[in-house]
Swiss-Prot record:
This is Alpha-elapitoxin-Ast2b. Keywords: Acetylcholine receptor inhibiting toxin, Amidation, Disulfide bond, Ion channel impairing toxin, Neurotoxin, Postsynaptic neurotoxin, Secreted, Toxin. The lineage of its organism: Eukaryota, Metazoa, Chordata, Craniata, Vertebrata. The modification Arginine amide is found at R72. Belongs to the three-finger toxin family. Long-chain subfamily. Type II alpha-neurotoxin sub-subfamily.
Length: 72
């Protein structure tokens, strides 16, 4: 499985990590810089905390941050 780690940057996931994710949230600079974004591989879909959005998927490079487009 390959997942995006950032804009147009994809990497093969380590063994046992079969889920891609995109985690977004706002911090103090959200109004000027936009959402904070973490992308990557995981063994299971991370648990979202209040104010954090997480999207998970399980096909190659499926963890697209929609505001960037496909990244391809």
């Amino acid at each position: 499985l390959s997942c995006y780690l950032g804009y147009k940057h994809s990497q093969t996931c380590p063994p046992g990590e079969n889920v891609c994710f995109v985690k977004t949230w706002c911090d103090a600079f959200c109004s000027t810089r936009g959402e904070r974004i973490v992308m990557g591989c995981a063994a299971t879909c991370p648990t979202a905390k209040s104010g954090v959005h997480i999207a998970c998927c399980s096909t190659d490079n499926c963890n697209i941050y929609t505001k960037w487009g496909s990244g391809r």
